[in-house]
Amino acid sequence: MPNADSLVKLVPMERPITNEAGWRGSPDLWLEAAYDALIESGVEAVRILPLAKRLDLSRTSFYWFFKDRGELLDALIARWRDKNTGALLRQTDAYAETIEEAVLNVFDCWFDCDLFDPAFEFAIRSWALQSEKVESEVQKADVLRLRGLSRMFERFGFGDDIADVRARTIYLVQIGYISIRTHEKTALRLARVPYYVEAFTGRAPQHKELNRFLSRHVEDNSFQLNKIIPINEPPSDAS
């Protein structure tokens, strides 16, 4: 039976992640650098040598984690798909007692970049103008997102046709905002929320629903929507 010393020699050592130049990085590090370059300058900036310089790593370090630039670009698309499409679909499925509350759940995406990244969305859609492959990915994402929004309306009793139209209204308005790079103060955007909800659903949201929404996006508890734009409380159901 081998002794402890010989057992150590028999165990294969994990390959080191350093070379003469230092740390090789990691897949996530290279992907994050690619993301930053895409957001800042578009897909043409996502190239191995500039990324290596950005990370202060050797060019050859890249090939420890990705076969080539194409594989890195595929990883960027997958990251966008998982983050933005994934988040939107989760929000359409989130618990809600009313369609107004369900729409407010979706609006979380428009106010929280950790959920839905508008800069990433803009960059991918700009890239799609140059690439049929990426355009196809965007079209697939659009279909999935619209289906998710339509199903959300159907859960609350809307017919197929009107659910589809309302879903498109919500989605295409927001994609339009992103595409033309609209910049508005957060307070103004928040003040418009109840009116967007009513426009998209045909029903005014209740104060309790708006307050829950605000609690997720406003740190200052003194912020009140009705101090900016008056909101009418819908009448309560007769008991």
Identify the residue ranges that each predicted region occupies.
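N-terminal intrinsically disordered/low-complexity leader segments
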Residues: 1-25, 204-239
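Generic hydrophobic, amphipathic alpha-helix propensity
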Residues: 23-35, 51, 76-84
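Helix-turn-helix
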Residues: 29, 37-75
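Short helix-capping/turn signature of helix-turn-helix
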Residues: 66, 112, 124-130
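Hydrophobic/aromatic residues within well-ordered alpha-helical segments
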Residues: 69, 76, 80, 84, ...
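Hydrophobic alpha-helical connector segments
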Residues: 89-122, 167-170
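Amphipathic alpha-helical packing segments from all-alpha helical-bundle domains
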Residues: 117-122, 132-158, 162-168
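Hydrophobic/aromatic-rich alpha-helical bundle segments in the mid-to-C-terminal region
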Residues: 155-216
